[in-house]
């Protein structure tokens, strides 16, 4: 009987984890656009170097790359 209870608790925990993941990731998924790559980085964390890598990637693949450091994050 103990195993059945553990299984139910595990299933409930998994379901809640999946639901929380979907809710929290919905805002991140809302900005996805075909053929465009947006990279968010803090302005003090190598922004310029990453922007240069993005330019090379864009030149090599044709995928538009935007490197941003949003103030509201």
From Swiss-Prot:
Residues 1-30 form the signal peptide. Keywords: Periplasm, Signal, Sugar transport, Transport. It is found in: Periplasm. GO terms for cellular component: periplasmic space. The keyword Signal applies. Involved in the high-affinity maltose membrane transport system. Initial receptor for the active transport of and chemotaxis toward maltooligosaccharides. Belongs to the bacterial solute-binding protein 1 family. This is Maltose-binding periplasmic protein. It comes from Photorhabdus luminescens (Xenorhabdus luminescens). The gene is malE.
